[in-house]
Amino acid sequence: VAILGDGEDSRQRDREARREGRRHKSSMVFQSFGLLPHKSVRDNVAYGLKVRGESKQVCTERALHWINTVGLKGYENKYPHQLSGGMRQRVGLARALAADTDIILMDEAFSALDPLIRAEMQDQLLELQKTLHKTIVFITHDLDEAVRIGNRIAILKDGKLIQVGTPREILHSPADEYVDRFVQRRAAVV
């Protein structure tokens, strides 16, 4: 599967261009938080900006803005081990948002959270997206989650793209037997 950035296939770029693209065009929220244990919440959120070469003032201002926005005001000087799983995931989200990239990759970002915190994080992401209008690639194995937060869903099997469509298209017009079974499995649980 190719990733296009500014209409260009990322696989065709040289190593340095791909590195620059990762620094300036995309940010990531990991399933296992990906926080630096020896850095405070503020420093974790500012980390991508620092690596990119932003000034200390810009790093601090953006970090504090996004810490407040994701509901962690008052926790900027805490360390990851002092936070709950949901709070740690908010730090990861704030770090991705602080970088102000065009694309945010979220790899199973909410899967390790309990159902209530997970729903809270989904709500927060949907609210933020109303004003951000970012391209968010949200990887999940949970069709309910995909239907809830996605405006387009891509279903893959064994590394191959099987179907892309709106949630409605996926649910009501499965492309093949695999997608149909995937959808039916969801219906059986509900």
Predicted regions: what is each one?
Residues H172-V190:
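C-terminal boundary and immediately downstream tail of ABC-type ATPase nucleotide-binding domains
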Residues A146-R148:
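A short, surface-exposed alpha-helical micro-motif characterized by mixed small hydrophobic
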Residues V1-I117, M121:
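ABC family nucleotide-binding domain
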Residues V164-G165, S173:
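ABC ATPase "signature
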Residues R118-H133:
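Helical segment within the ABC ATPase nucleotide-binding domain
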Residues Q31, H133-I139, H141-D142:
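Conserved H-loop
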